[in-house]
Structures are given as C-alpha cells and as structure tokens.
Amino acid sequence: MLSNLLILPMLLPFLCALILVFLKNNDRISKYLYLGTMTITTIISLMLLIYVQRHRPITLDFGGWTAPFGIQFLGDSLSLIMVTTASFVITLIMAYGFGRGEHKANRYHLPSFILFLSVGVIGSFLTSDLFNLYVMFEIMLLASFVLITLGQSVEQLRAAIIYVVLNIIGSWLFLLGIGLLYKTVGTLNFSHIAMRLNDMGDNRTVTMISLIFLVAFSAKAALVLFMWLPKAYAVLNTELAALFAALMTKVGAYALIRFFTLLFDQHNGLIHPLLVTMAAITMVIGAIGVIAYKDIKKIAAYQVIISIGFIILGLGTNTFAGINGAIFYLVNDIVVKTLLFFIIGSLVYITGYRQYQYLNGLAKKEPFFGVAFIIMIFAIGGVPPFSGFPGKVLIFQGALQNGNYIGLALMIITSLIAMYSLFRILFYMYFGDKDGEEVHFKKIPQYRKGILSILVVVVIAIGIAAPVLLKITNDATELNTNDQLYQKLVNSHLKGEE
C-alpha cells in the first residue's frame, strides 16, 4: 500500500496541470490549486523520505509487471531527497510568481508548464527504468522550451533555439546509448543492468556506451557543454530563471551520479579521470564568466556552471567521501541557486538595471537584501557554518584521497573567484551611491521578501543541521556505490533471472 504513494509526487502535479487548462478564467482558484498541490507533494515526498530512512527503499511496479519487464519507480535516499528538495523549491518558485502581472496573455499557461516540467523532473528522480528516464527528459525538454518562449521576444526565441538544438543532440545520444545498451545486456532496469554489467566485466562495447551516456548527460547538466545556459537564463523572468537554475542542470548531474556509481563503476579507469577533467574545464570557464561580465544575471548563470563543476569533481574522485560530498552539494545547490536567482531578479526589478554598477547603494535603503546577499555568498563559498561547507569539505577530502591535487586547487581557486564576483556586486549594493543623483527604487512586494526569508532560513538550517542531511547522503552513497547491496534492498526478486 505504501509503495502506491510513490506515484503521487509525479501524479499530483500532472493532474493539477491538466485541471489548470480548464480554469484559465478563474485566476484565484488556479493559484491556490497549484500552490496547494505542490505543498502536498512536498509533504508526501518528505514522509516517504522519512520512511525510507527508518526502514528500506520503496519500489512500485506499474500494471503488475515486475522489473525488469515492467516500469518501476524507486524511492531510495538519493531519489527521495532530490524529489523532496525539488518539490519544496518549486512550491516557493510558484509562490514567488503568485502576483506577477507581466506577460498577461501567457500567465495562464505559465503554471501549467511549470507543473509539467516538475513532472519530468520528479519522474527522472524516481524512475529506475532507462527508457522511462528518457521519456521524463523529453517531457522536461518540451515544457522548458515552451517556458523559454512564452514571452515571444526575439532574445527568447534565439536562446530557445540554442537550448533546444543542444538538448536534442543530447537526447539523440541518450536514445542511441539506450539502444546499444539494450542490445548488449538485454534489459533497461537499473538493477538488472548493474547485474549484467558486473557479469560482463571490462568490455570495449560497454565502455563506448558509457562514453555516449557521459556526453548525453553532460549536455543536460551543462558540464563543458554549457553554451545554451547563460543566454537561456538571461532572458527568463525571475521565477523561471530560478526554476531552471535550481533544477534543469541538477537532473543531468543526478543522472551522472546514478549512472557512474551504480551502473558503469567498473569502467572508472577511463570515465572517472574524464569526469575530473571535464569538471576542471567547467569550473575554469565558469570562473572566467563570473569575472568577465557586469550583467548580474549572466554572473548568476556562470555561478551555476561553477557549481556543476564542483559536483562532478566529487563524482570523478570515485571515493566515498567525494561522491557523498557531490550528493550533499547537489541537494544544497538546488536551494542556494534558487535563493541566488531570486535575489538577482529582485535587484533587477528594484533598480531597473542588470549591470551591477547601477545598484546605487541599494542595500542602504533595503538592508534586507544586503543581509540575504551576504548569507548567500557564504553559502556558495562554503564558509562554515553555512550550507555549502559540508559538501565542499567532503569533495576536498575525496580529492585528497584520490590524489587529485590539481582538481582540489582549481576548486579552491574557483570558489574564491565565485565569492569575489559576488562581493563585487555587494560592494555596489552598499557603496555604489552616485553623488548628487536622486535614485528611485521600485518597491518589491512583501510576500516576495517573505519567500526570500524562508530560503535564507533554510540555507542556514542546512548548515546547522548538516549531520541529519549527511545521514541521508551517506545512505544514498552507500547504496549507489555497492551494487550488491542495491540489488539486495531494491530488487532481490531479480536474483537468478536470465
């Protein structure tokens, strides 16, 4: 009975999105409906996470067809901490846009497609079937393309074309990898794939397939292949930019973690050094980006790229500490990047400018944003006791254990550069007053300050309550780095199947 609840975090947003299509003339009911739906989804996800922590992973086989023949959802520590965090930030993002007045012609479509996007995101985290993961990625791609183009501006259409072309290439490679892997092992279920690959040992065909998946997921995660990201994020309104920054690249990073710990770990002689190299390139180019631009929305976009480099560096160390740190930082970064883009969007709204030199001492008149920005900088920089600290320490530890001193040095340097670029913005927030000029700032709605306050509190709480979250990420790391334990806890009925 409990396993049936596993479908609800995906089913509820899907049903709500369909209902909203017929409620476009009743704005108030629609708003309370989608906020209520995502709140309930978050609560259910949290309840499932607590159960899994106290007992064991949950599986749901659809239509009575057991894995590996049927579609299966898996609720383990990794998938459910991701679903819970994603549901939480989606709720806040939709609440942030509650009173938005621009794009009136499209405002009725916006919540529906955000919910469809959340279906793809949550489904990607829950599925333990490779083809179903592909389907969820395509749902995300379709919904995200619509969201990028809703404003119908030339800039949005240009960004959408770049975004879609690169993601379609990634999808083609993903589908090619699925076909080759199925031909090789004869199954698409994660647990069954792990069993078959273990029996095969090192194999050139499997190595080639793993490289195809690496490129496909790198396009989704903006790992090296990030050309679409800065342009796409820069043209989005605040809540959509926060949504994309918090979740889109994180789904790709999640897939990389799941694949290259559980499925293709035996081929780490090639894959993991390649992951470290790609992470290093991503961190360096991200650091160049945050220094090169004065546009605060583009600076925020390159901050996302740097954080992806951190996460994949942890995965590439192929150590328990590094992978644990990657998972912790991945979860934390969903919250922190939501906060970053909310603050950046608020600064643009208040001042009317995207260049930091026009912030005109805003923090003196709006001290709330100054304090929130400082806390966010410390969280991104990994300063104790803020939320970025535990994940970065574990990634540092993993890099040391692996002997990857270049990756470790690059992580330290790019972390400092990332903080410097944000402190540069903060400087103008406090000391950018223009003598003799009267500056007029727009007032931001109080409820949006309330949402920002919630995120600030959560960022602080993650740092303080790190031992609780580390227990979850420890369990997730142990399960995904021990394929025999994974098979025993998740799909013990597969033993002996051909």
Swiss-Prot record:
Keywords attached to this entry: Antiport, Cell membrane, Ion transport, Membrane, Transmembrane, Transmembrane helix, Transport
Q: Which GO terms describe its molecular function?
A: antiporter activity; NADH dehydrogenase (ubiquinone) activity
- Cell membrane listed as a keyword: yes
User: What does the entry list under GO cellular component?
Assistant: plasma membrane
Looking up InterPro entries in the UniProt record yields: CPA3_Na-H_Antiporter_D, NADH_UbQ_OxRdtase, ND/Mrp_TM
State which residue ranges cross the membrane: 2-22, 32-52, 78-98, 108-128, 130-150, 161-181, 209-229, 240-260, 271-291, 308-328, 330-350, 368-388, 403-423, 450-470
Regarding the membrane, this protein is recorded as: Multi-pass membrane protein
The keyword Metal-binding is annotated on this UniProt entry: no
Write out the annotated subcellular location: Cell membrane
A single GO BP annotation from the record? Answer: ATP synthesis coupled electron transport
Query: Which Pfam families does this chain map to?
Result: Proton_antipo_M
What PANTHER family does its record include? NA(+)_H(+) ANTIPORTER SUBUNIT D1 (PTHR42703:SF1), NADH DEHYDROGENASE (PTHR42703)
Assembly, in brief, is: May form a heterooligomeric complex that consists of seven subunits: mnhA2, mnhB2, mnhC2, mnhD2, mnhE2, mnhF2 and mnhG2.
Family label: Belongs to the CPA3 antiporters (TC 2.A.63) subunit D family.
The protein's name: Putative antiporter subunit mnhD2
